[in-house]
């Protein structure tokens, strides 16, 4: 059995720092408009060329187990920031490295790590307060496009995401898929769609497209399996008198009930399409209820005391149009009351906040989008697979950044906001003493690092630019692309406040923990066994 190695004090902290630096140095070359790419080896397929901090961090495993612990800690900073805000992972890594570097200098010089940590936490709380105070809400489509363009480093992508958000609303679902073509396009599926199609192909109205289109139909929603025609007859007769088509959403329609519907359709007495209810179990009940609210109908369920044979026209939902394909049903223009839909949306949002399961959250978000007005699909195309994967990652990042911006507003980008909150930390420093004051100073100094790194990646002297930006009015900063000093928000160089805040909070959290390390236990690296020597050439 391999023994463990134990390192203490300075040795432990320095070994961790080497790991932190190895990971951070690989990630930080991607920061800013002139950041470079990193190539990742893939065991299968071609290497991946990317610009996304968290994807690079995830790939890094160091050979030395102690250094690897340091790298894994910083990886957590990037991953956590990605989970919370979906972007800003490189910034978070750069901040963590700076806080660790400055903090270790002070610990080596004899500062008490526990008190330093207190100072760091105080400084971060103050900084977050300042970020929230200067954040501007995002209202226009242009502002959304700017946020997305900065995150993806591409104006076209910015416009595409802004257009998608405009079409499906802030709560709509926007998915990113790989396309076969060269260009990147946007498709919007309006209305509520679910993945169930017609039960019988005899129900189609358009044989060329193999789909059924019902205009201004009645919609019967039930959680029952319908097999006896006697259950359906009363409501069918009422619908026939109106001359409108009928959509039936039920657990299943079979036997004589299905045969009757098909015969009526073929004779032209009643245009009717039956589809199975979406989802399973409790989720099915919830989705049927969503459809009922969207179309101003009721779920005809014996659990609620309604029998199918007693159903009336007022219990049926209405919509402008329903399109039913082989495996999909789309309800467009449901006639539910906006207040009822709003209430339902608020209820689902509450459930999203409270759920702990990622799967449930994803399903709830899908339901929310379907109620809120549709689904947009961005089809990513490129000349090669390597380029397409890189582009898809950037679009996903930009999408996350945009959602974060809508949630908590925007601040000046390019590391500028961090520079302008330094003043508030200087004031805070005056009120503290001893090692706590040093902790605040560590964060104050670390806040310069993102801008410095952006400048270095643009081939300039970082500290000169930082000093110059400190003298500019709040909101003015350095545009690394044109190498000019500008009003950042007016120039469209913005970051979501949520990303700026999360990056700092997560970086400080992990860095402060690392500073308080006094001992470290790790596996001993195993020595590779030597194989037998080559035989002497004389013996050949």
Swiss-Prot record:
GO terms for biological process: protein refolding. Keywords: ATP-binding, Chaperone, Cytoplasm, Isomerase, Nucleotide-binding. It catalyses: ATP + H2O + a folded polypeptide = ADP + phosphate + an unfolded polypeptide. ATP binds at residues 30-33, 87-91, 414, 479-481, 495. GO terms for molecular function: ATP binding; ATP-dependent protein folding chaperone; isomerase activity; unfolded protein binding. It holds the Pfam family Cpn60_TCP1. Together with its co-chaperonin GroES, plays an essential role in assisting protein folding. The GroEL-GroES system forms a nano-cage that allows encapsulation of the non-native substrate proteins and provides a physical environment optimized to promote and accelerate protein folding. Belongs to the chaperonin (HSP60) family. This is Chaperonin GroEL.
